[in-house]
């Protein structure tokens, strides 16, 4: 097997937090808040920029640039040839960088293809190669017969925020945090941590997102046992209005295929786990 498929480690693994899939039930959140050290906010973007590769996290003296440079080179020279029969390495590298720009965003195959001067079917094929190598995954849109105006495109996430930062040439955690992609990287990191919490328990992550044609979006829906737990994701300390968005999900609780809407919240830069209302919480990102 290829070393490219080494599973990136979640932050929880790095600090030896007990494994458990992340479902934002109130008792789970309160228990974790009690048991677990929070990732300090000042370290958050260091962690996002550093990424989740075990080799980088276990050897601080390892140079970030050199590590990712050789990682990408190995991937292009060995894995891509095996997986994609791509003849033009440079063009595939340009594609990889262009794809990194989409992390945390809805996929637009045509726009991505145009940037790299390939056809949309080729872009689709090459993204499958990245997914097969474990570099990206797709978050599919939530579908329910009562939600008529749902967007159908998946969202793209790079499994390692460090690799995405390298490909987009963010040279430090500080420039990344201050830059135009900060929210996308924050969202990518949050979704990754939750995604990995299921993978690490041997489960297929029951995750999706919902966005309607008015661009109202719930960033993450966790569906388990006939219940949907909604999460908003916001890079601010107390995003008051986010919970209101959950109202667009109300129709799913009615009719033949009714699902319950469980507790949820906003994963944000709050310092403490705090209730927003009877069902929802401000969830500090460090609690993931």
Residue ranges and their predicted role:
Residues 2-3, 7-101, 105:
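Interdomain motor-coupling "hinge/lid" segment immediately C-terminal to the ATP-binding subdomain
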Residues 11, 109, 191:
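Generic structural marker for isolated residues within well-ordered, non-membrane alpha-helices
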Residues 34, 58-66, 85-89, 102, ...:
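Conserved phosphate/pyrophosphate-binding and hydrolysis machinery centered on Walker-type P-loop NTPases
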Residues 106, 111-116:
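A short alpha-helical element within helix-turn-helix/winged-helix DNA-binding domains
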Residues 118-132:
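Short amphipathic alpha-helical interaction segments
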Residues 128-129, 134-136, 140-288:
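A cross-kingdom feature that marks ATP-driven nucleic-acid transaction machinery
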């Amino acid at each position: 097997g290829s070393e490219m498929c080494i599973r990136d480690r979640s932050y929880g693994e790095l600090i030896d937090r007990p494994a458990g899939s992340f479902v934002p039930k109130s008792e789970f959140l309160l228990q974790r808040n009690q048991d677990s050290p929070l990732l300090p906010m000042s370290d958050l973007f260091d962690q996002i920029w550093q990424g989740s590769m075990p080799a980088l996290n276990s050897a601080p003296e390892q140079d970030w640039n050199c590590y990712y440079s050789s990682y990408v080179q190995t991937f292009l020279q060995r894995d891509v040839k095996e997986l994609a029969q791509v003849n033009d390495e440079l063009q595939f590298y340009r594609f990889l960088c262009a794809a990194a720009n989409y992390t945390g965003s809805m996929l637009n195959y045509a726009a991505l293809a145009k940037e790299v001067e390939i056809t949309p079917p080729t872009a689709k094929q090459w993204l499958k190669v990245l997914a097969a190598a474990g570099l990206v995954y797709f978050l599919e849109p939530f579908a329910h017969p009562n939600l008529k105006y749902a967007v159908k495109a998946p969202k793209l996430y790079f499994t390692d925020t460090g690799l995405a930062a390298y490909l987009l040439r963010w040279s430090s955690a500080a420039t990344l945090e201050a830059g135009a992609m900060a929210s996308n990287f924050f969202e990518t990191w949050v979704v990754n941590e939750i995604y990995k919490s299921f993978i690490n328990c041997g489960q297929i992550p029951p995750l999706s997102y919902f966005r309607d044609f008015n661009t109202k979006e719930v960033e993450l829906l966790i569906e388990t046992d006939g219940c949907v737990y909604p999460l908003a994701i916001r890079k601010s300390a107390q995003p008051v209005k986010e919970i209101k968005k959950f109202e667009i999900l109300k129709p799913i609780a009615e009719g033949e295929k009714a699902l319950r809407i469980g507790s949820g919240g906003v994963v944000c830069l709050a310092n403490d786990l705090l209730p927003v209302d009877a069902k929802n919480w401000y969830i500090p990102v460090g609690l993931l």
